Amino acid sequence: MEFVNLYIQSEYTLLSSTVKLNNDFGKILSQDAITSCAICDTNSMYGAIKFYNLCKAHNIKPIIGLKLNLKNNYSYDNNVLLYAKDNTGYVNLMKLSSYAKTNKVVTIEDLSKYSQGVLCILPASESEACKLFLSGKYDSFTKEYNKYKMFEDLYIGLDLQGVSKHSEIEEFYSKKTMFNFSFVGLHRVNYMSDEEFDAFKLLRCVDLNSSSYTPINNEEFWGYCHQNELLNEFRKYPELILATKEIANKCNVEIEFGKYKLPKYSNEITDTKKYLHDLCVFGLKRRLEKTGNLDNTNMYLARLNKELNVINKMGFNDYFLIVYDFIKWSKKNGILVGPGRGSGPSSLACYCLGITEIDPIKYDLLFERFLSEERITMPDIDTDFPDNKRDEVIKYVFNRYGAMKVAHISTFGTYGPKGALRDIARVKKIPDLFINELLKIVNNFSSIKDVEENDMFIRLINENSNLKEAVKLAKIIEGIPRNISTHAAGVIMTEEDLVNYTPLQPGMNGLYQTQYEASDLEKLGLLKMDFLGIRNLSIIEEVIEEIKRNENIVIDVNKIPLDDKKTFELISRGETEGIFQFESGGMRNVLTKYKPDNILHLAYVNALYRPGPMEMIPEFIECKFGRKNVSYLHDDLKEILAPTYGVIVFQEQIMLIAQKFAGYTLGEADILRRAVSKKKKEVLERERIKFVEKSGLLGYDSKVSNHIYDYIVKFANYGFNKSHAVVYSILGYQMAYLKTHYYKYFMANMMSSGINSVNLMRQYISSCKKHGIATLPPSINYSTNRFETYKRKNRSGQEVDVIYYPLIGINNVGGVIVKDILEERMGNGLFKDFEDFVSRTKKIVNKRVATYLIYSGALDDFGLTRKAMVDKYEEVLMRSDYGILKDQLNEIEYPTEEYAFDEMSNYELDALGLNIKYNFLLKYASVKKKYNCLNISELKVSSRSNILCVIRRLKTIKTKNNDEMAFLELGDGENIVDGVIFPKVYQNIKQILQENEIYVLKGSLEVRNDKKQVIIENAFRL
């Protein structure tokens, strides 16, 4: 006899269960000899697919259930347990869950629409009808109970979880004949052991935002029970046990996996194969005409026809047409589309359709890396859009294909070690002092298990029982979903209504959102498309618009020359601040040494600049400039690896090596590459045997083929997707081109993008200064909500470029206030003077906002001192209330006294987060000159220099030898850099070191782990 558990609530009943749907759970069920069990989460089905597959993997029959909170007609809670008897019932459960998530309140009448194929259990302790029965209100009970008779299979669920449960069962048994009841045994599970009960209560506290949780519904009995315990518990009621098996036998859902359920492009086009072919051929002709490459038409057609044949055989014609359609719509509506992403640019068909912007033949890209008949997977065409236009494209797709066929995808924020400990500390009221010390250690580990061997960790928790308990709880809740959110890019599309494949819930911007995660949806064969919002595309778009507006020049970034000498000179100088993919300090250092002069060079650097391959960069550079000879493991590798100086840089090279040495098709070679990259021993050995055998057929001896195979295995993880490297290098190049030829517009937009980062602001302002462009403080008459470029006359009367700091960048001046100020300025003209400003903005700004506008320099144009404007603001405000009578009042006298320099500097720093006009170091200009001090931005690697700076932060540590040393953050008002003082030097100067004091430091700049730092040799305080 088996008690089939029909009431397991998983971790996906968020913050109400610690039952994890993982392999450990599957093992527990298997060890208990369980043949069937059910998931029954509340209102949602987030975990249904995971549960289904987990059960199948352990030879357990999965029963898909759903607990629904129903609208009550009396004063009792009203819950019902529903189970899918067949696939129709499964779809109906998804519809009911969608309805519950969308409409919040579900009535019994709503159930009737979706009762087919569904079995219903009324749990005695949770059903309103059952509570009416137990209260002796039989007339009311009968009225409610009869409503559920729409279900062919209707049961009363009886449990023994709590006191007085036997008497409840006897009460129901006594009226069994009268009401023709069918009963079934229930045992609710929300945690797996007594140890997990505390974790369960903790999750309830998090959910309820409380520091304590008192069980009121017999929760202390909701733990998992083994079969022998359940059989013993229900031994007096064998019919309740038998009924669980009876229900299990009635529930037979078989979910289909692996078969694609792709949407149709259009019902009006009957022959999508021909339509796609014609579009591609037309697009190819247009591409070749523009590039002057018509002589190679036959070669391109051969490749195109080969690709289209594979696309058609695999049933993806509609997929390509759908992507083509929304890309075409985007371009037609002035939305910049990225040149490509991932492996999609490897397809000539994508290039012909305008989906991507690079010629795969020109760059030797392999279609099989993207799609092949040997690898039965969905093609993955990810598309990049400006982050402020992405939603417009999704809205178009939504409107074109329908609300029930397009949806966002759910994703879950799960507990990591830090998040778990923080929530536990908050609930348990553990002082920050203690938990923060623990978090400092945990911060470097991905799980509690990984950190348990750390000596400091062990000592800390052994010294503090509260921390020890917190860690114990954290281990239990780690990995459990804490909240649901929306996938950053993914959108799901189907031909039929989505609710036939996945339960839904409300999503963003009027779209639905799937309850199933992306991994579950892909297993179901549903089409996921990634619409990525890229800030860099927004910047490019905005720069182009500004150039058009100010210079009347129209730029198409997809038509700019890709061999512009000046652009590559800028890149080779490492002046790539703000350039996508190339802006980090370490990358800029590599660029200055490698000096790329074409797109492929940029792709090489892009591919190599990652942990692992980065180690090969010095040798790569030496080989490029002929300072080191290129060597090959075998002469036959030369034609494949010569372009990359004998180094495997790209995944495609691994595929070509497998083709060359073992006769693999490129599709087979890609499968090999994917297999060996996982480094599983049994896979490696199996693939080695196959590779060596195939290699022998081509005449290579086993010693050579084994060496080549080892070579492939070594670099399988290092290799980068060539098409992705090329397209993202082109995107970076496009930004570099704009920076080279339209510097002021580029920098103004980069500054607008990075306004929330003071460090970036300092870096960009410093860069502009080097190019002769001054960044001016905000101006109430010329600044807007972004950085704006203007022409202004300098002291010599020459017109120069300047960039105004935006009003939105002033602290305490919010977006709504800026909007209202700009509307006032637009409607009624520039502000004439201080009194005009106060009068016209008195309903927009208060004294605090006005003060920060003054501190920032935004009102300097009025010719008054900042101190006078702050002091006289309220008097001017009061005067403005007199309207036309104010002319009869005495004129306001404005004193000429100004704040001291240090005050001005501090006020400006408070208002803007940095100094633009009143850099505190300006007063030390003579000192800077005397000691020949350099700005931080002027420091050269390994060159000893003097720096005039402030110590922003100072932290001392002790070495293993118990010697003191210090780490610092240094600033010169424009840039910041880390500093380090080693023990010997620190002993000599430590008595003069203090935060927020100004010093002349002597030291040399070094680059370690991609970060610059100054090794300080001496210091004196000013």
Show which residues each predicted segment covers.
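Noncatalytic, beta-rich nucleic-acid-contacting surfaces in large DNA/RNA-processing enzymes
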Residues: 4, 35-39, 55, 191, ...
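Glycine-rich loop at the start of a catalytic domain that most often binds anionic cofactors/ligands
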Residues: 18, 45-60, 197-201, 351-361, ...
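Hydrophobic or amphipathic alpha-helical targeting/insertion segments
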Residues: 44, 48-104
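Short secondary-structure boundary/capping segments
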Residues: 53-55, 136-137, 171-173, 198-203, ...
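Acidic, His- and aromatic-enriched active-site or binding-groove loops in soluble protein domains
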Residues: 62, 66, 82-87, 181, ...
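Active-site or pore-adjacent capping/gating segments
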Residues: 80, 197-277
